[in-house]
Amino acid sequence: MRNQGLGSWPVRRARMSPHATAVRHGGTALTYAELSRRVARLANGLRAAGVRPGDRVAYLGPNHPAYLETLFACGQAGAVFVPLNFRLGVPELDHALADSGASVLIHTPEHAETVAALAAGRLLRVPAGELDAADDEPPDLPVGLDDVCLLMYTSGSTGRPKGAMLTHGNLTWNCVNVLVETDLASDERALVAAPLFHAAALGMVCLPTLLKGGTVILHSAFDPGAVLSAVEQERVTLVFGVPTMYQAIAAHPRWRSADLSSLRTLLCGGAPVPADLASRYLDRGLAFVQGYGMTEAAPGVLVLDRAHVAEKIGSAGVPSFFTDVRLAGPSGEPVPPGEKGEIVVSGPNVMKGYWGRPEATAEVLRDGWFHSGDVATVDGDGYFHVVDRLKDMIISGGENIYPAEVENELYGYPGVEACAVIGVPDPRWGEVGKAVVVPADGSRIDGDELLAWLRTRLAGYKVPKSVEFTDRLPTTGSGKILKGEVRRRFG
């Protein structure tokens, strides 16, 4: 085959295990042979619609087989897949579509109203399943590992979402890392209730499982009771989630009685696993495989395996097998054990750059290393401990919230003179946003009205849960807001 990318995977896997179940969703089950045929029909349909190699094809919808079919079909057609966060508002979706230059948007029925409201002019909007061609012979175009496979949008310190260009090689090497670290098997039954528009659910679970010939069980939304039922009824072997999801499962009334004997692997990312949560699962004979990563690394960077969870609780782990990680000082110099430094990453899983953003790319990719903006220490055994975030990012229930993006919107509200968004502790979500606002002279701002206004402009999880008003914010001599001082005073 001339196609060496992800688009060839369904064809290659169908040759090896055509009758094995690839994907389950609700009452639908697809074998690898069926998945391969469906992917080929969609790839041919995209080509018939005018999609050419390098063109961008977007997808909007919850976890569904159509997501994976569109991803692989883009790979066969040589196109670039653009998964969209269905929790975003219309203005945010418009930005991603315009920035990526997507020519086609495939969507599931529940998002038809949102799709109709989009401003994108020349965009071909197609309900999932309606672009399939009759020909199920897969196109074999020359696609290499260095070609861009997908654009995954991630906000940055500037507050404007950027499309991380992940190549076919980035995603393939990340899968190899996962297979080495977690011992995934061909009889794997992996439950995915976390959204696939995030790099972790896709890169750490779906793709490695499909590469090995296991079964991916998709849930459109997370429900702790449904997860417990699926584990029992489907004999699930692997579950992925963020700490808040695992907390909800452990708090469910059926937690103690549910049969979890089939589970072999619990993958957790997005935030460190609290010690008490790890203990609750250890009491049921279950240990987490924890990870630290980022979209720009497809996403795996550090891994803490089962054998060291109890010994290294709170650690983010050691570098993934084919990934190099070190700590750098302000001038890029190496940092000795025990001292703080910025996490920098190198390896075949690190992105090609940000789509259409050469300056932003140059800021983070320097001398072959990706500069994460996260601060950590390394202990004497080589285990990394993430201690701070240079970018002030808030992690709420596994979702990344960048204050600059929220602050940009706040400044558009009448009467807001200055503002800062910080993260504050929350028993359920780990951390939530709080807006600290300075009203302009003579302005009276109602906090509830301000938050309601934000909900029309941002995804719900990005909207701060509270507002506090103040006469002034602490600043440097040049007028830059001192976020650390804001957190100390108002957090």
UniProtKB/Swiss-Prot annotation:
Molecular function in Gene Ontology: (E)-caffeate-CoA ligase activity; 4-coumarate-CoA ligase activity; ATP binding; trans-feruloyl-CoA synthase activity
Tree of life domain: Bacteria
Gene3D superfamilies: 3.30.300.30, N-terminal domain of ligase-like
PROSITE patterns per UniProt: AMP_BINDING
GO biological process: vanillin biosynthetic process
Binding site for ATP: G291, T295, D374, K391
pH dependence of this protein's activity: Optimum pH is 7.0. Significant loss of activity at pH 5.0 or under and at pH 11.0 or higher.
Record text on activity regulation: Activated by Mg(2+). Retains 73.3%, 61.2%, 36%, 22.6% and 4.1% of the maximal activity with Mn(2+), Co(2+), Ni(2+), Zn(2+) and MoO4(2-), respectively. Nearly loss of activity with Cu(2+), Ca(2+), Fe(2+) and WO4(2-).
Keywords for this protein: ATP-binding, Ligase, Nucleotide-binding
Signal peptide: none
Catalytic activity as recorded in UniProt: (E)-ferulate + ATP + CoA = (E)-feruloyl-CoA + AMP + diphosphate; (E)-caffeate + ATP + CoA = (E)-caffeoyl-CoA + AMP + diphosphate; (E)-4-coumarate + ATP + CoA = (E)-4-coumaroyl-CoA + AMP + diphosphate
Temperature remarks: Optimum temperature is 30 degrees Celsius. Denaturates at 45 degrees Celsius. Retains about 60% of the maximal activity at 16 degrees Celsius.
InterPro entries found in the cross-reference section: AMP-bd_C (IPR025110), AMP-bd_C_sf (IPR045851), AMP-binding_CS (IPR020845), AMP-dep_synth/lig_dom (IPR000873), ANL_N_sf (IPR042099), ATP-dep_AMP-bd_enzyme (IPR050237)
EC identifiers of the protein: 6.2.1.34
Pfam families named in the record: AMP-binding, AMP-binding_C
PANTHER family: LONG-CHAIN-FATTY-ACID--COA LIGASE (PTHR43767), MEDIUM_LONG-CHAIN-FATTY-ACID--COA LIGASE FADD8 (PTHR43767:SF7)
Entry similarity comment: Belongs to the ATP-dependent AMP-binding enzyme family.
Annotated function: Catalyzes the formation of (E)-feruloyl-CoA, AMP and diphosphate from (E)-ferulate, CoA and ATP. Active also with caffeate and 4-coumarate. Less active with trans-cinnamic acid. Not active with 3-methoxycinnamic acid or 4-methoxycinnamic acid. Involved in the degradation pathway of lignin-derived aromatic compounds of plant cell walls. Catalyzes the first enzymatic step in the conversion of ferulic acid into high value compound vanillin.
Entry protein name: Feruloyl-CoA synthase
Gene that encodes it: fcs
